[in-house]
């Protein structure tokens, strides 16, 4: 976006990785507030219903990163994302919960004119109508990436999508309990499909992750949580 690092301000978060509304930095019309629907380690959701109206009142733009968590809106856990619809823009991935091939991300913008103005690639030799699809993305031409997403949604249907997400959330909770019983530390509340895990020592954590990855049967994603190694399980 062209911002220098001195323009970035990190908001204070609580123990679950959610922005703390009481410690939100001051905002104005130049502010772009980035919120999360599904924190990458814990699966937690920012307090949209409280944070977004405050940002709007200050004239800020609110963007929600919902790479996997935005799909909770289609499940029995929709309450986790209460207020997310108040934002100005959203992003999500199809290759995560929809199981489509990689390169199936999507961006949604409330203000179509603002999006078209930012992405416009018209030239003297290539003009287009106001609603031309080429003016909604950085790429002048691209393949039909949306077909895989359409096929997944058409195949699952609303009920199938809800059942799949509900099942994965339920399985994440079951996995967390099994890991606790096996002597591992589960570091998050498993409200969604993420299970954040640590062994008794950093060495055990790293060894467990590397052994799982080497098995070729399962993938434990590496991460750092509160200054120490951990690994992520995403269902």
Segments (PLM) and residue ranges:
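Conserved PLP-binding catalytic core of the aspartate aminotransferase-like
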Residues: 184-212
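Conserved PLP-binding active-site segment of the aspartate aminotransferase-like
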Residues: 34, 196-202, 217-235
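Active-site C-terminal subdomain of aminotransferase-like
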Residues: 82-182, 187
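Anion (oxyanion) recognition and catalysis
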Residues: 56, 180, 213
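Conserved PLP-enzyme active-site core in the AAT-like
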Residues: 1-116
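A glycine-rich phosphate-binding loop feature that marks nucleotide/adenosyl-phosphate handling sites
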Residues: 15, 71, 122-125, 188-196, ...
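Conserved alpha/beta core surface patches that mediate binding of polyanionic ligands
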Residues: 128-134, 212-219
């Amino acid at each position: 976006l062209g911002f220098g690092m001195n323009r970035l301000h990190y908001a204070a978060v609580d123990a679950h990785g959610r922005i703390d509304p009481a410690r939100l930095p001051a905002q104005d019309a130049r502010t772009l507030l980035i919120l999360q629907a599904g924190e990458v380690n814990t699966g937690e959701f920012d307090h949209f219903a409280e944070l977004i109206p405050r940002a709007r009142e200050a004239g800020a733009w609110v963007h929600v990163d919902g790479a996997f968590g935005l799909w909770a809106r289609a499940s029995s856990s929709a309450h986790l994302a209460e207020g997310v619809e108040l934002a100005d823009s959203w992003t999500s991935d199809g290759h995560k919960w929809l199981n489509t091939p990689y390169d199936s991300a999507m961006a949604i913008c409330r203000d179509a004119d603002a999006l078209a103005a930012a992405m416009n690639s018209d030239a003297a030799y290539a003009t287009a109508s106001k609603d031309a699809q080429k003016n909604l993305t950085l790429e002048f031409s691209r393949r039909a990436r949306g077909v895989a997403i359409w096929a997944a949604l058409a195949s699952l249907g609303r009920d199938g999508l809800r059942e799949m997400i509900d099942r994965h959330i339920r399985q994440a909770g079951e996995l967390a309990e099994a890991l606790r019983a096996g002597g591992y530390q589960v570091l998050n509340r498993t409200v969604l499909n993420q299970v954040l895990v640590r062994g008794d020592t950093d060495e055990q954590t790293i060894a467990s992750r590397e052994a799982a990855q080497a098995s070729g049967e399962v993938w434990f994603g590496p991460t750092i949580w509160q200054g120490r190694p951990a690994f992520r399980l995403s269902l």
